[in-house]
Amino acid sequence: MQAEERKTTMDQNETQWDKLLKIRTTGRDDSHSDQYRYPYEPTPYCVLERLANSGMIGKQNTVLDYGTGKGRVCFYLSYQTRCRSVGIEYDERIFSGAMENREMAVSGARTCFVKADAGEYPVPKEVDWCYFFNPFSIEILQKVLARIYESFYEHPREKILVFEII
């Protein structure tokens, strides 16, 4: 398959999943990115399909998506695995997109979104999966990991961190 054909197939997959989930998450947005917070760029559905099909996430789990953007990870995983999901986003405009999506999304009832600075956000005790898709710099990541460790020590449990770095 040629590169152009692969891109067209991938774009169709992105659009089809958004339509099925009743959300709008495609595209990239660099308008509020800087050296610490990276552009809005949703995780490709092919990556989420592999994660969901791993069988490691189920309805007993709660996923925390750092830099959730418009909520694609939360909506997809909640739909496919029946898990609960929490999305953290600092950008007001993009956060508004996640909230609009939640109103229409088929899995909206199992998702929630918080507008917050990821480095300051206290990790809820029920969270056992943390997902990162290239959301921010190492400086912010260090603060986030400190919060995750705090939560783990306060409420010991198995926790899984998933990093997708581009």
Language-model features: where?
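A short SAM/SAH-binding and catalytic strip from SAM-dependent methyltransferases
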Residues: W129-I140
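Glycine-rich SAM-binding Motif I of class I
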Residues: G71-F75
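Conserved SAM-binding loop
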Residues: A98-M99
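C-terminal substrate-binding/active-site "lid" region of AdoMet-derived donor-dependent transferases
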Residues: E139-I166
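Conserved SAM/SAH-binding beta-strand->alpha-helix loop
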Residues: D91
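S-adenosyl-L-methionine
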Residues: M1-G58
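Conserved SAM-binding strand-loop segment of SAM-dependent methyltransferases
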Residues: G108-D117
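Conserved class I S-adenosyl-L-methionine
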Residues: Q60-G67
